[in-house]
Amino acid sequence: KGVFLLKEVTTSEKRIPALCELYTWLYEQGEHQIDYMIANRNGEYISSLDNGDRYMLKKWYAGRECDIKKTREILEAAGNLAKLHTVMRHELEYGITEGIKTGEKYRRHNRELKKVRQFVRKAVPKGEFEFAFLQQFELMYQWAEAAVCELEQSDYEQLYQEEMNRSGMTHGEYNYHNIIMTREGIATMNFEKFHRDIQVEDLYYFLRKVME
């Protein structure tokens, strides 16, 4: 009985045992306002159709998404995240992936920027946007390279290792879509992208989505 969500599976089946273990751990620590997967008649969490589509059934909550135009709800969501993070420092029996380090992300983005510049240079004919892009690219790229240098000179690597030693985990997709305001308080949904990482990454991602 209650509210449930039938959802198409986009995550790897290999992650399901770790995801189940995470949900169990959170629930045991008193985090009852979370979604979790419901097993089918065969005791499996994923049900496949003849055409190959895969679905899972999840416990859901009646409510609405966090309203990012209301300061009070943003603060409540941030407090909810902090509470989650205190219990999301735990070594799971099933191994989980580590997040891509920020430096690697920055360098990858910079390589992609160069590829975009190369593509725009070869574009024929060029319009107003293409000329403006090429004119401003060098300044933008200098800022991108400066960000990499700043990160390399910071204590990021030490902070990352400390978080790994504490078995820190992040939600991985903590945005207003996954924060449901209910009569009983905030319900946190969709932990499918959880991974090992510096936990403040969740807060950064949440605030970035708020400011967008």
Language-model segments: which ranges?
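ATP-dependent phospho-/nucleotidyl transfer catalytic cores
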Residues: 7-13, 94-169
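A ubiquitous short alpha-helical element
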Residues: 101-104, 192, 210-211
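Hydrophobic/aromatic-lined pockets within catalytic cores
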Residues: 85-89, 148, 152, 211
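A generic short alpha-helical patch detector that favors 3-5-residue windows
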Residues: 50, 108, 195-198
